[in-house]
Amino acid sequence: MMNKNLKDKDYLELLSKNYPTIDDASVEIINLKAISQLPKGTEYFLSDIHGESEGFEYLLGTSSGVIREKIELLFKNTLPEHDRVELQILIVDTKNLINQKSSEEDFNDWCRITIYRLIRICKVVTSKYTRSKIRKKMPSNFAYILDELLQTGDEENKENYYFSIIDSIIEISAEEKFIIALCHLIRQCSVDRLHIVGDIYDRGPHPDKVMESIMTFNEVDIAWGNHDIHWLGAAKGSLICVANAARLAIRYNNFDLLEYSYGINLRSLSSFANEVYKDDPCEVFKPNTLDKNMYDEVDKELAAKMHKAISIIQFKLECQLIKRHPNYGMDERILLDKIDYKNGTINIEGKVYELKDKNFPTINPENPFELTEGENTLIQSLAFSFINSPVLQRHMNYIYDKGGIYKIFNGNLLYHGCIPTKEDGTFDDVYIDGQYLSGW
């Protein structure tokens, strides 16, 4: 009994720091019980975004049909199909639709009606949240007005007050900004929590824009994917991660991402590649041009040379890493010493294959894993750019802050790929740097 009393005392002392009086504790109990009676907030799960910012923006904007569902619920019997579709487009792509409408003669009337309709939608999507939570999601510049409009009912004595606010917004030419704020709040409240289940980066052109969109949400968690982890490593200066991140970006022709968005200086890589592979067409290494670069258009032949140069550096660094860590059990991935450089073949598990590319001027057959002086200078220069990119560091710090190898939320285990576990479901031990580690 004494041990139980001591334990209770510890809990009470801990609680007293936040709730020093009985009244404080009572109010918090009432609040928590009331909140528990509200409907559960909408959770949105997205994975494998791979830099496709436009598709990601659309999915976020529509909330996978949640917004369309609310519009139909409110206006199916009172608005024609065209107007209902226009409302959805407005919420998803607010600025573009406003720009289209602003040149029309009845723009002010359209704004007045639209604000009224958006408020009705907003009342529905916010109905499952407390006022405190809604305020946190509101754009700060219109928070007071939005709060007033959302809390005003249909009572006759409040009707004039309600419409006078809307009239005042239009009279001072704040209607466009207010509609943008309303649409933003609707999008925010249509999804209570955003779960990103890995692979924000690589392949697509703008993971940077995806990150900026994610960072506008109040409630976010991120389970790191393999394509995110090497960017995390690159931002910390890991040479092998730098090589892999740069290689994949070049492979998919994402020069805008590297140079324009993140300020990664590729001049040393282009100069090195052009010199070392001057007479080599590097056909095997031609990048996949799925998307065009707007700001940093690189010649396809030069891009292929750059791709080959950084790939060879990565292969060497990978072999060095595996050699340093035999406990990884990845010796089968050491391939540079399996190549017959004279005949242009490779021996894998007793079978000889002809190589598609046989020109390796930077590889010493006697020591194939060693970087040349030029390669070492180049990868160090790239690492410096990754470490000193303010935008990249801001994005990676956010991923560190909001993420992990796995996340547990609402009883759900979220992870992107594979996590080593034992048969009973507990985390397996992995030997790293002289010790066995498990978990997170």
Feature locations, PLM:
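Feature recognizes metal-dependent phosphohydrolase scaffolds
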Residues: M1-W440
